[in-house]
Amino acid sequence: AFEIINDIK
């Protein structure tokens, strides 16, 4: 679930 977090950054 790191892709979503990386999208926000």
UniProtKB/Swiss-Prot annotation:
Cofactor detail note: Binds 1 heme b (iron(II)-protoporphyrin IX) group per subunit.
Compartment list: Secreted; Secreted, Cell wall
EC number in record: 1.11.1.7
UniProtKB keywords: Calcium, Cell wall, Heme, Hydrogen peroxide, Iron, Metal-binding, Oxidoreductase, Peroxidase, Secreted
Cofactor(s) of this protein: heme b; Ca(2+)
Major subcellular location class: secreted
An annotated Gene Ontology molecular function: lactoperoxidase activity
Catalytic activity: 2 a phenolic donor + H2O2 = 2 a phenolic radical donor + 2 H2O
Record-level GO cellular component terms: extracellular region
Keyword Metal-binding on entry: yes
Example GO BP: hydrogen peroxide catabolic process
Main function: Removal of H(2)O(2), oxidation of toxic reductants, biosynthesis and degradation of lignin, suberization, auxin catabolism, response to environmental stresses such as wounding, pathogen attack and oxidative stress. These functions might be dependent on each isozyme/isoform in each plant tissue.
Family, as annotated: Belongs to the peroxidase family. Classical plant (class III) peroxidase subfamily.
Protein known as: Peroxidase 9
Gene source species: Cycas revoluta
